[in-house]
């Protein structure tokens, strides 16, 4: 009798007390690399520049003069709905992964994507109440990786796909990282366009 009372009343109360983890990502996220012990990538923000993604530095953005004071700040790389950039430019900017594994985004005013690229496939897994893991889950990938670029101080972001074609050609020099996604609380859209 006592065991059935515990099962009937106590266990449901314990379930209610357990921490709730949201399964849906926030609409607008910023991503920061986490790989403790690898200071060359750990805690660096993922930035959009040159139609690619990088760790560190600043985003490359543009806003036409005619927009004037209505230009979004353009000082953060913000992802909208996991698969596109948080931009005001008509038509938006979609994200993709090239056959090489390189993460990229479309040029403003164009839907052109490199042949063979994977559109979609970006995912979010809750880590706690305030953040989640942002990653690419297509083509057998399970994480993101930062790859050194010859003659650059920045690391370029790739999906950890088999046979990735990375700058310098040596995938062993790349560093896998957890893309920690947190809600962006600034002005949205975050930029007119990323360049």
Curated annotation (Swiss-Prot):
Predominant location: secreted
Asked whether the keyword Glycoprotein is assigned, the reply is yes
Keywords assigned by UniProt? Glycoprotein, Secreted, Signal
Q: One cellular component GO annotation, for this chain's record?
A: extracellular region
Q: Does the keyword Secreted apply?
A: yes
The record's annotation in InterPro entries points to: PhiA_domain
Compartmental location: Secreted
| Secretion signal span | 1-17
Carbohydrate-modified residues are 75
Write down what this protein is called. Uncharacterized secreted protein ARB_07637
Q: What is the species listed in this Swiss-Prot or TrEMBL entry?
A: Arthroderma benhamiae (strain ATCC MYA-4681 / CBS 112371)
């Amino acid at each position: 009798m006592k065991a059935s009372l515990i099962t009937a009343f106590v266990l449901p109360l314990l379930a209610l007390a357990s921490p709730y983890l949201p399964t849906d990502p926030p609409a607008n996220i910023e991503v920061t690399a986490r790989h403790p012990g690898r200071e060359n990538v750990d805690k660096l923000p993922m930035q959009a520049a040159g139609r690619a993604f990088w760790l560190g530095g600043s985003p490359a953005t543009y806003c036409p003069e005619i927009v004037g004071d209505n230009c979004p700040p353009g000082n953060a790389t913000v992802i909208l709905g996991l698969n596109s950039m948080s931009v005001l430019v008509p038509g938006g900017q979609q994200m993709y992964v090239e056959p090489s594994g390189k993460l990229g985004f479309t040029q403003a005013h164009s839907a052109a994507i490199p042949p063979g690229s994977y559109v979609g496939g970006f995912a979010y897994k809750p880590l706690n109440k305030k953040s989640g893991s942002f990653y690419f889950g297509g083509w057998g990938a399970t994480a993101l990786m930062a790859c050194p670029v010859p003659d650059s101080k920045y690391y370029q972001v790739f999906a950890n796909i088999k046979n990735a074609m990375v700058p310098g050609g040596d995938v062993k020099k790349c560093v896998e990282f957890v893309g920690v996604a947190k809600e962006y609380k600034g002005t949205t859209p975050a930029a007119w366009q990323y360049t």
